[in-house]
C-alpha cells in the first residue's frame, strides 16, 4: 500500500513541426506548460507576435501541426500501485503516444485527462512520451464542411471555430490577434498511488440568523482496491487553527462527514466585510499510514440572484449573505494570447487592481477559457465576485452527439473544479449567442419547453444553454445560480431593458449615441458597455518600432486596433466633444478623456438607479484588460497600466459618493439653439449598511475666471440612506440669461468632518470651452522612502489631470477634476525623490 506521489513533467521536453522528419528538427522546450509560439520564440524561430506587424509573420504557425516529446523515467513503484499520466490541459487536438502506442486522443482544450499507464510502463525504465497536436484551424474547417446544413451564423473569427472546443478568441476577435496556439498549456504529471482522493467538496447551509452553519464534506476515492481499513479524516481550520475534526469510513467509494460551526466567520465581497476562508482537509489513512491528503479553501456565505416583479419590470441583482450588492465591475478576457505566460503573481496583480479600483465583480467572458486556479484563488482571497460564463461566444453552435458529449464532460469537469470557490456566484451559458440568434433570424420559441424539439430547429445550441449546462450545474453545484446567456431575460429580445441582463453597445457601436446620456440607455443589469481608448505612450512604444510610425493614424497603430470601424468611431466621439490634435501624445490623452467620461456617465447614473428599487443591479464595463499590447476598450492595458477611466470608475464606486449633473443639451442636431434654462440634479449614493450623516456643498464656478457666479448651496446634516440613493435636488434650475458664462457645478461631500467624495459637472462639449491659463499647481508636500504626497490646487477649473503611468509607480488618484478653493491630495508610491512627476490636463 503506497502513499500518493506525483512527479511534475515540466522539463526535458522537445518539439518540432510534425512534418519535419530530420532528427535535427527537434528543438528544446524551456518549460512546460507552454504553447508552440512561446517555444518557437525561445528557439529564435519566431519574432514576438505582439510587436509591429509580426502577427502576420506568425500566421504560418496557425496552419501547422506539432509534436512534443519527452523521455519518461519510470518512477519507483510498490506492488499494487497504479501509475497515471495526468494532463490538466492539452491544446487542442492531441494524440498521446507512449512508446509509439496511442494511449489518448483528445479534442477539448478545456478538459483534463487521466490515463492509466501501469502496464505500459512494465518493461524498462525509459519510455518515449509523444504528443501530436493536429492543426486546430484546419480541423475546424474540415468539421464545418461535414455539416453544410447547419447555419454557421456568428460574430468574430472563422465560424468554423464553433466546431472546436478551444478558446474562441484564438481565431481572432475585435480586440486581439489571430494566434492559433497548440501545446501542453497546463501541467502534466505522473502520479503513483494505490488509492487517491479524486475529489473533495462541501455543501454549506448557513442559518438565516448567521449564528450557525452546517458543512457537509465529501470525498470521492479512486482505488486499485477498497481496503476495509481505509479511513478518511476531515479537518477544518480557520486562520491556521483547527476548529473541527471528524472521521468516516468510505462507503461505495465515498466518505462523508457533517460539521456544525457556531458563530461562523462569513465570506464577504471586499468593502462589505472580511473575505474569510476556511481550510477543509481530507486525509486518507490506512493502518496509521497517510496515503493521500487534499486541501481546499472554502467560504461560508449565501449568494442569490434576486429576480422579482417591480415597477421597472423584473429585477436582476445579487444578494450576498442577505445584503443587496450593487455589482460595479468589469468583464475579463484572457490576459494573454499565450496563456501560459500568465503567472499566478500576474493574476493576483490584476485582481488587486480591481480591489483598489473598488470593483466588486469580474465577468469571465465566454470566448476565452475557464481560468487558472490562481485567478479564482485571488478572487476568493481578495473578495471579488465572479460571474462565470461557459465557453461559448457569439455564434450558433452545432450540436453533434459527440460534440454534446464533449461539452458535457467539459462542463462537469470545470464546475467540479471550481465549485468550492465562494467568489463564483453565477454560471452563465454563453456570451451573445442569443443575439446571434436574433440577428440571423433563427428559430426560438420560448414557450416550447421540449428540449428535443430545440435540437430540430436551426438554433440547436439552445439545447446546450437551457438543458445541458443547467443540468450539470444543478448536479454539481446546485446552490449556484444559472443564467442561460448574456444578455438574456426570460426569452425576450436581448435588448429588453426591463428584464435580465443587457449589453448596451449603442454608445460606440449601434446608433452611436452621445455618451452624456449613457445612463438613460441601461437595463436591469448592464453586463457589457464600453468605449475605446489608446493605451499609454510607453505601451505604444513597445509595439511601434519605428519613430516614423508614431502618429495617430499610422498603419501599425491601425493594425493593432482590431475593432471594426475603429477610426471612424473614435473620430466621431473626439470631434463631437474635444478640440482634436494630431501629435500622438495628445491624441492618446484625448481618447482617454473620452473613455473616462463615457465610463463615468454610465456608472454614475446606473449606480444612482440602484436606489430606485434596484432599477439597475450592476454594471460590468467592457473590458478590464487586454490579451496583447493594443488599442481597445480596456481600462487597464496589457502591461497593467491603468488608463484614466480606471480612476474615474473608482471614484464613482466610492462607498459613499456624491453626484451632480445638468441635463444634456445636444448641439449636434439641426438648428440647435442655446438653451435658456437647464435643469440639474444633486444626489448621494451609499453602499454602507448603516445610515450616515453628512454635509453636501454645491458651487457654481466660472470656467473662464474660477470665480463663483452664484451663491453656493450647502446642505447640513444630510441623512444618507444606507445601500441606496439620497436625492437632494431633483429640480435645480440654471438660468442662462442670468448665469450666461460657462461654469462647472462642483459638489463635495463631508462625512465625519472629512471630504469623502467629489463630483464636477462640466458644460458640454469641452471643445467649446477655453482652458487657457488654469493656474494649476502640483506641489510635493512630504516624502518618505516608500511614499510621496502631492497637493494640487488651481485658480481656474481643470479637467482630467492625468499623471504619467510608470511601471512600479502607483497613484492614489488620477484623471482628476480640480477646482478653485478645493486643494486635493495625491499619494504616490514608487516614485523616487529626484524624479519629476509628469502630468497632463485638458487644454494644456
From Swiss-Prot:
Annotated active site: 432
Molecular function terms from GO: beta-mannosidase activity
Highest taxon of the lineage: Eukaryota
Function: Exoglycosidase that cleaves the single beta-linked mannose residue from the non-reducing end of beta-mannosidic oligosaccharides of various complexity and length. Prefers mannobiose over mannotriose and has no activity against polymeric mannan. Is also severely restricted by galactosyl substitutions at the +1 subsite.
Miscellaneous comment text of the record: In contrast to clade A beta-mannosidases, which are likely secreted, clade B proteins appear to be intracellular.
Stored PANTHER family: BETA-MANNOSIDASE
Residues passing through the membrane, by range: none
Residues of this chain annotated as glycosylated in UniProt: 723
UniProt record, GO biological process: glycoprotein catabolic process; polysaccharide catabolic process
Protein name (Swiss-Prot/TrEMBL): Beta-mannosidase B
Amino acid at each position: 500500500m503506497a502513499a500518493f506521489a506525483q512527479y511534475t513533467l515540466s522539463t526535458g521536453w522537445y518539439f518540432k513541426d510534425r512534418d519535419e522528419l530530420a532528427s535535427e528538427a527537434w528543438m528544446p522546450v524551456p518549460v512546460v506548460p507552454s504553447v508552440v509560439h512561446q517555444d518557437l520564440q525561445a528557439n529564435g524561430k519566431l519574432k514576438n507576435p505582439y510587436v509591429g506587424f509580426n502577427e502576420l509573420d506568425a500566421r504560418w504557425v496557425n496552419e501547422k501541426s506539432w509534436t512534443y516529446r519527452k523521455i519518461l523515467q519510470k518512477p519507483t513503484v510498490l506492488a499494487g500501485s497504479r501509475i497515471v499520466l495526468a494532463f490538466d490541459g492539452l491544446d487542442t487536438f492531441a494524440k498521446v503516444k507512449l512508446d509509439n502506442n496511442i494511449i489518448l486522443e483528445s479534442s477539448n482544450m478545456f478538459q483534463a485527462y487521466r490515463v492509466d499507464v501501469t502496464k505500459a510502463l512494465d518493461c524498462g525504465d525509459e519510455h518515449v512520451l509523444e504528443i501530436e497536436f493536429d492543426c486546430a484551424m484546419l480541423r475546424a474547417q474540415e468539421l464545418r464542411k461535414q455539416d453544410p446544413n447547419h447555419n454557421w451564423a456568428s460574430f468574430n473569427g472563422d465560424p468554423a471555430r464553433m466546431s472546436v472546443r478551444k478558446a474562441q478568441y484564438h481565431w481572432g476577435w475585435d480586440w486581439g490577434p489571430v494566434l492559433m496556439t497548440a501545446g501542453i498549456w497546463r501541467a502534466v504529471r505522473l502520479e503513483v498511488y494505490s488509492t487517491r482522493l479524486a475529489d473533495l467538496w462541501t455543501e454549506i447551509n448557513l442559518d438565516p440568523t448567521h449564528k450557525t452553519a452546517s458543512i457537509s464534506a465529501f470525498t470521492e476515492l479512486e482505488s486499485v482496491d477498497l481496503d476495509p481499513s481505509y479511513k478518511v479524516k476531515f479537518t477544518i481550520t480557520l486562520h491556521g487553527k483547527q476548529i473541527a475534526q471528524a472521521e468516516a469510513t468510505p462507503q461505495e467509494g465515498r466518505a462523508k462527514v457533517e460539521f456544525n460551526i457556531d458563530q461562523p466567520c462569513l465570506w464577504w465581497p471586499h468593502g462589505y466585510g472580511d473575505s474569510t476562508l476556511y481550510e477543509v482537509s481530507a486525509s486518507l489513512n490506512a493502518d496509521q499510514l497517510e496515503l493521500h491528503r487534499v486541501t481546499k479553501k472554502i467560504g461560508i456565505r449565501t449568494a442569490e440572484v434576486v429576480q422579482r416583479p417591480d415597477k421597472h419590470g423584473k429585477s436582476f441583482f445579487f444578494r450576498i449573505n442577505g445584503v443587496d450588492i450593487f455589482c460595479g465591475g468589469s468583464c475579463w478576457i484572457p490576459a494573454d494570447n499565450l496563456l501560459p505566460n500568465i503567472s499566478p503573481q500576474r493574476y493576483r496583480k490584476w485582481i488587486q487592481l480591481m480591489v483598489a479600483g473598488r470593483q466588486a465583480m469580474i465577468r469571465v467572458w465566454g470566448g476565452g477559457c475557464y481560468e487558472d486556479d490562481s485567478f479564482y484563488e485571488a478572487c476568493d482571497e481578495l473578495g471579488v465576485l465572479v460571474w462565470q460564463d461557459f465557453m461559448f461566444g457569439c455564434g450558433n453552435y452545432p450540436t453533434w452527439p459527440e460534440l454534446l458529449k464533449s461539452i458535457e464532460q467539459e462542463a462537469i469537469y470545470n464546475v467540479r473544479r471550481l465549485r468550492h470557490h465562494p467568489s463564483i456566484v453565477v454560471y452563465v451559458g454563453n456570451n451573445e449567442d442569443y443575439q446571434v440568434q436574433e440577428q440571423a433570424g433563427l428559430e426560438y420559441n420560448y414557450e416550447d419547453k421540449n428540449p428535443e424539439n430545440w435540437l430540430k430547429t436551426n438554433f440547436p445550441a439552445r439545447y446546450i444553454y437551457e438543458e445541458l449546462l443547467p443540468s450539470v450545474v444543478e448536479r454539481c453545484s446546485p446552490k449556484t445560480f444559472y443564467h442561460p446567456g448574456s444578455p438574456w431575460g426570460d426569452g425576450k429580445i436581448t435588448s429588453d431593458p426591463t428584464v435580465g441582463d443587457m449589453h448596451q453597445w449603442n454608445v460606440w457601436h449601434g446608433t452611436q449615441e452621445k455618451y452624456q446620456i449613457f445612463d438613460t440607455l441601461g437595463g436591469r443589469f448592464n453586463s457589457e458597455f464600453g468605449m475605446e481608448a489608446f493605451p499609454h505612450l510607453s505601451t505604444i512604444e513597445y509595439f511601434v518600432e519605428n519613430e516614423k510610425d508614431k502618429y495617430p493614424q499610422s498603419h501599425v497603430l491601425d493594425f493593432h486596433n482590431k475593432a471594426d470601424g475603429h477610426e471612424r468611431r473614435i473620430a466621431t466621439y473626439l470631434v463631437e466633444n474635444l478640440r482634436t490634435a494630431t501629435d500622438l501624445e495628445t491624441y492618446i490623452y484625448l481618447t482617454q478623456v473620452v473613455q473616462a467620461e463615457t465610463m463615468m456617465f454610465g456608472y454614475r447614473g446606473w449606480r444612482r438607479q440602484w436606489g430606485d428599487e434596484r432599477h439597475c443591479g450592476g454594471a460590468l464595463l467592457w473590458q478590464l484588460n487586454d490579451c496583447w499590447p493594443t488599442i481597445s476598450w480596456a481600462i487597464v492595458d496589457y502591461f497593467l497600466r491603468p488608463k484614466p477611466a480606471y480612476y474615474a470608475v473608482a471614484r464613482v464606486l466610492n462607498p459613499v459618493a456624491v453626484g451632480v449633473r445638468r441635463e444634456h443639451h445636444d448641439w449636434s442636431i439641426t438648428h440647435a439653439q442655446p438653451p435658456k434654462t437647464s435643469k440639474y440634479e444633486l444626489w448621494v449614493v451609499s453602499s454602507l449598511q448603516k445610515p450616515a450623516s453628512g454635509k453636501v456643498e454645491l458651487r457654481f464656478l466660472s470656467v473662464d475666471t474660477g470665480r463663483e457666479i452664484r451663491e453656493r448651496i450647502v446642505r447640513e446634516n444630510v441623512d444618507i440612506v444606507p445601500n441606496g440613493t439620497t436625492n437632494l435636488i431633483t429640480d435645480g434650475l440654471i438660468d442662462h440669461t442670468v448665469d450666461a458664462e460657462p461654469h462647472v457645478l462642483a459638489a463635495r461631500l463631508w462625512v465625519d468632518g472629512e471630504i469623502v467624495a467629489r463630483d464636477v459637472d462640466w458644460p458640454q462639449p469641452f471643445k467649446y470651452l477655453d482652458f487657457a491659463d488654469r493656474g494649476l499647481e502640483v506641489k510635493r508636500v512630504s516624502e518618505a522612502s516608500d511614499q510621496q504626497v502631492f497637493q494640487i490646487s488651481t485658480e481656474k477649473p481643470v479637467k482630467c489631470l492625468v499623471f504619467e503611468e510608470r511601471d512600479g509607480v502607483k497613484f492614489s488618484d488620477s484623471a482628476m477634476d480640480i477646482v478653485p478653493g478645493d486643494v486635493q491630495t495625491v499619494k504616490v508610491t514608487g516614485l523616487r525623490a529626484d524624479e519629476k512627476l509628469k502630468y497632463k490636463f485638458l487644454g494644456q
